[in-house]
């Protein structure tokens, strides 16, 4: 069984949520790890003490904090570039943020909000687990379909139905809407921009292509953002 959803791993710090979701699916414990390839050099990621050792030879949290302080450039922090260089410096921005973010969002970092860079705070330890959460796992059979099949058991499902044709405000006290939010409100403030992805699947004649489930390619001259090797999502890859 192959986890076919890419590097999207169920994770939470909430014990109540974890216990609830485990009613519908058996999870296998999994720790997601990511590496960065920048112009052929491999770095630990998210940025942690090993990353800073690879960059500058920092071997202690104190050394790393001092070096980061030296690299910081005064800036408004109003966009992704300004925030990263003001917090972490120009070198870290170029290696880990610029190319990857501009490929992903299809616009210059000066036009990307600073909040994008704040999602993965720098770590002054050697923890390289991508998700710094208490619970993290992958469905044992490789897919999430059974969760939704069990969640929907006994619940009316309407297909080929326009949500706007329903008197949806009276359906429930709380409602989860997963469609385009701009369409729901009849494009009152105009259409929103949506980011899309292009997937290319390749089968390689090797039992180990890159040695990790996810490799991010952060150089702007590489036309893709990452390579995912699905075998590493298994607790016992073969």
Spell out what each predicted region is.
Residues 1, 34-38, 215-217:
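Short acidic-hydrophobic surface loop/beta-edge motif
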Residues 1-24, 34:
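Glycine-rich FAD cofactor-binding loop and adjacent beta-loop-alpha segment at the N-terminus
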Residues 4-8, 134-138, 199-202:
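A short acidic, glycine-rich active-site loop
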Residues 29-32, 210:
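A short, compositionally biased
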Residues 36-174, 178-185:
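Active-site/ligand-binding neighborhood in enzyme catalytic cores
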Residues 161-238:
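Mid-domain catalytic core of redox enzymes
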């Amino acid at each position: 069984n192959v986890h076919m959803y890419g590097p999207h791993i169920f994770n939470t710090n909430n014990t109540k949520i974890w216990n609830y979701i485990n009613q519908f699916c058996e999870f296998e414990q999994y720790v997601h790890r990511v590496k960065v390839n920048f112009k052929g050099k491999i770095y630990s990621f998210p940025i942690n003490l090993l990353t800073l050792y690879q960059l500058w030879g920092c071997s202690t949290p104190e050394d790393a904090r001092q070096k980061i302080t030296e690299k910081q450039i005064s800036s408004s922090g109003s966009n992704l570039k300004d925030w990263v260089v003001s917090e972490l410096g120009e070198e870290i921005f170029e290696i880990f943020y610029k190319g990857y973010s501009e490929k992903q969002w299809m616009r210059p970092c000066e036009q990307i909000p600073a909040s994008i860079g704040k999602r993965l705070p720098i770590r002054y330890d050697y923890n390289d687990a991508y998700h710094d959460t208490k619970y993290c796992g992958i469905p044992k059979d490789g897919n999430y379909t059974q969760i939704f099949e069990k969640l929907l058991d006994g619940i009316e499902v309407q297909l080929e139905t326009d949500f706007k044709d329903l008197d949806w405000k009276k359906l429930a006290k709380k409602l989860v809407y997963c469609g385009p939010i701009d369409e729901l409100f009849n494009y009152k403030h105009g259409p929103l921009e949506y980011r899309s992805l292009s997937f290319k699947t390749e089968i390689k004649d090797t039992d180990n292509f890159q040695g990790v489930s996810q490799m991010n390619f952060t150089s702007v001259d590489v036309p893709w953002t990452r390579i995912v090797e699905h075998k590493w999502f298994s607790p016992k890859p073969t």
